[in-house]
From Swiss-Prot:
Residues 55-89, 339-363 are annotated as: Disordered. It comes from Vanderwaltozyma polyspora (strain ATCC 22028 / DSM 70294 / BCRC 21397 / CBS 2163 / NBRC 10782 / NRRL Y-8283 / UCD 57-17). Residues 342-363 have a biased composition (Acidic residues). This is U1 small nuclear ribonucleoprotein component SNU71. Its main location: cytoplasm. One of its GO terms (biological process) is mRNA splicing, via spliceosome. The keyword Ribonucleoprotein applies. Component of the U1 snRNP particle, a subcomplex of the spliceosome. InterPro entries: PWI_dom. The gene is SNU71.
Amino acid sequence: MSNRDIVYVSPQAYLSSSQDWCLNSQQKGYIPILQNDLLNFKKILDLKKPKTTSINRDHENVASSNSKNSNTNHLGENNASTNGNNLNLQNLNDNINNNDVEKLSYQNMKLFHPISTIDQLYTVSLVGVPTALSDITLETIFKSISNDNVLSWSAFVSAVLDSKIVYLRFKSTLSKIEFKKTLLSIQSILESKDINLGELHYDSNVKDFLNSIDLKNEPIPNTSQEKLINTLVKIISENVPNSNDTKNKIDSDHPESYEIDLGTLSDIPSDSIEQLCKDIIDFRTKVIKIEREKKIKQSLEESRLSKQKLDKIFNQIKKTRNLTPIDSTKSMEGGVLAATATEEEARDDYEEEEDEDEDEEDDLKILNKSIAQEKEESNQRYLMLLNNLNKSIEPNLKKLSHSVLESTNYLDIITSNRSLFNKELQILSTDVYYDHNTSFRQEEIRKDDIDRELNPHVKLITTESIMSKSVEESKESLDKNEQASKSIITQNENISVTSDIKIKLAFKTKIDKSSEIYSSSETESDEEIKHLQTSIRESKNKTTDIVTSSGKDNSILTFTDDELQKRLTQLRESKIVDELVNEYLGVYEDELVDYIFDNIKENKNKHLLLVDLKETFDDDAIKIVDTIWKHQAMLP
């Protein structure tokens, strides 16, 4: 789950119609929820918005009490505490009757959650507070009994109980002594028999914190606050009615009117019972609201139809009254018949309207059906075109691209596959079913002549030109090998002059034989070329044997591994091997280039590399190996 799926919302900001109720970054007072749950969050708050607006109106009508003695909130002395209580006592009724409260310090339970350890130590709870007390009343009571030292408070309402738990958080600016004095004062007020505000509770950490505070000689606040207690009793009795009255006043749609049998929920954990009860009540209220809306719609529709019927009846009666006197007497005589006729006409009109509505519904169904049919046809056309693309168009394009590639590299393909073509021709010549006297031979000759006339600049490529070119290349390679062997022989003192003469004679005899073979006949050219290549290879093997026996040749690299690696990197950076492979092979091959470098690194031998490359490049392997070995990076 990414951070984009989470947003931070503030229920209070939403209920107060603030624009910053939803943020993408976390801030104090904002709750993280999934972005998909944002709509449900708004729906839930919209259901509660009327209640909050009524409370906000009460808040707006409430004004703060203008007290001149601003220092009466401190309980450092008895006089200060009693003055504060008297001040609260004077303004308590005014605050409730005139809604003279500044602003509710109530917070949602999620926002009220303590952030620091100081908040935990300054937080207590009141268990058993009546649910009938409104937020404004509780706010006024808390300010009066704590001398306006309550920072914020929150409440947890049970779905099955008539009381709620109120959490109070005092201001952290209070000193420890003042905090303990305030709690003692509240405890004394709550212990009164006439006041039903619940019991004061706090956890073990707060208890240890209070025990660590030593009042010493500090005066304990006066617990005889009879006037304040009497006023609180009066307020509670006015706002908390009897149980029988409340049951009669509860609306049937109110969630508190539902009674849930907790015996059926015995298998459910106790932690989730309250939430489940809330969900059940919400579900029931939603169902009732939906049913009520349906009934309202039905009643409105029935009233509309009945109104239409009555209007038609009245119109018919008006028409009958506007007749002539004679007609009117006749109509008076048959008044009953006219009334029945109007009723029948009204009934017929109503049936016609129903038929029209049914016709409209039928037209809508036909329209939707036609739209669905068109959509299905378009999908079928799309699938058919896609199938045609995959099975016909793309294979034809690949075939055409392959034929274009073959036509551009026509000469290379012929020379590389010459032996295969000759073998195919040989097989067809001996085939019984092959038509040697083809009827279209003359037509092919005619088209060939026309093509030659249209393209006179194209040179005719014959077997003789190809053979002569190959003979020249073989002679050049033999001359190079002869020169290399001469240089090696001159440097080597152990090689005799007779071996040099034998090598020269061997090269000359092979050259003479190759020239005689090419001049003999054209039909046996392929076999003679192969024989010539084998003879050339034998002569080259002889030269390699001579070179290896000499021992003074740079064909074997004597570099160390580190130095060889450096030289190979220089050779790779120069891209000379890539260019040679692309030039003689016609296509660039990464694997072949890597194979050449791996061979040089492992064997460090020029002739072994030449033998390996013979299979791929044939005679061009000599040029490739010589070019690599003459590169600056490979020189000693």
